[in-house]
Each structure stands twice: as structure tokens, then as C-alpha cells.
């Protein structure tokens, strides 16, 4: 695996994608968190909080948090899952907060595939058939954050719609 990072006493599940723009990671995180809750687990979610205007971290997202403080996706996750959500660019720090302050026993990272300082036990890549992946070129020439071959390292691929044959052939 490509990443380093401290292992935690509870599993960390990273949900992410290779492309810029929305591919469905947030709905996947919401579904996963709710499924884990039905199994009696106590999930917590870490997020970078894109769009946040916070100047101090961590931001603990609750029903009183304004979207400007945390970004719209962490607020949506908290409202749909009623589980702890921590926004912090330093995701390992956010994980510690969830474990120590909220007694979470499984951590989900929204859009964390490219955050290599964070250990992960399970990695899920999400694709949406309506997102244009261009010619599979990386930024700045194309829409990919990493080479498409990075998918060989993930544990699961979730596709909203049909997974393109070109992607399947590269796995």
C-alpha cells in the first residue's frame, strides 16, 4: 500500500475518488455510516470540510453548526446520520478526536484517498458514470488526481451507474 500513518485501535474506512468533482462519496459515506449504526457500531466521520471558513480546528459538526463553519457536505452527513462529524485538514487529528471524545469504534473518511498521512484499513473508490474522466489524464491536463491504475490498490470500487470498460480493463 502507498500510505503510511499511525494505526488506530479502531478501523478506518476511506471513501474517495480519483477525479475532481462530485462522484458520490458523500452519499456513500451516509449510507455506510447508517448501515454500520444498524449493526450496533458507533461510526464517526472525518472530513476536510471544503468550503469551510473556519479559522480554528477541529470543527465539531452538530445540529447548531452553520455550513459556513464546516462546509455543506459535513453538515449533510451529520444531519442524515446523526453521528459525530469532525472537520479538520489534519485528518489524523480528527480521528483522535472521534475516538477520544465521542467513543467512536469505526471511522469513515469522506474524500480521503489522497490523504496519505492517514492510515486506512479499508479503501473504497467511488465512480459516477456521468462524470467525464477525459482521456484518463492527471491534473492539470485532465480531471484525475492520481493515475487510474491507483484503483488496483483499493479494496472496493462502487460505481453509480455502469463502470466504464476502459476502467475495468486497467484493473
Protein language model regions, located:
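Walker A (P-loop) phosphate-binding motif
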Residues: 2-63, 163, 167
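Phosphate/Mg2+-binding loops and adjacent switch elements
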Residues: 50-170
Amino acid at each position: 500500500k502507498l500510505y503510511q500513518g499511525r494505526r488506530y485501535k479502531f478501523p478506518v474506512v476511506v471513501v474517495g475518488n480519483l477525479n475532481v468533482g462530485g462522484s458520490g462519496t458523500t452519499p456513500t459515506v451516509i449510507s455506510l455510516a447508517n448501515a454500520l449504526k444498524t449493526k450496533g457500531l458507533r461510526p464517526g466521520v472525518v472530513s476536510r470540510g471544503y468550503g469551510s471558513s473556519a479559522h480554528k480546528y477541529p470543527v465539531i459538526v452538530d445540529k447548531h453548526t452553520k455550513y459556513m463553519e464546516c462546509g455543506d457536505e459535513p453538515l449533510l452527513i451529520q444531519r442524515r446520520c446523526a453521528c459525530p462529524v469532525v472537520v479538520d485538514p489534519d485528518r489524523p487529528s480528527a480521528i483522535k478526536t472521534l475516538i477520544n471524545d465521542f467513543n467512536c469504534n469505526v471511522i469513515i473518511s469522506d474524500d480521503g484517498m489522497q490523504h496519505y498521512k492517514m492510515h486506512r484499513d479499508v479503501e473504497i473508490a467511488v465512480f459516477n458514470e456521468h462524470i467525464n474522466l477525459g482521456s484518463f489524464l492527471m491534473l492539470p491536463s485532465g480531471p484525475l488526481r492520481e493515475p487510474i491504475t491507483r484503483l488496483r490498490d483499493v479494496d472496493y470500487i462502487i460505481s453509480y451507474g455502469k463502470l466504464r470498460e476502459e476502467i475495468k480493463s486497467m484493473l
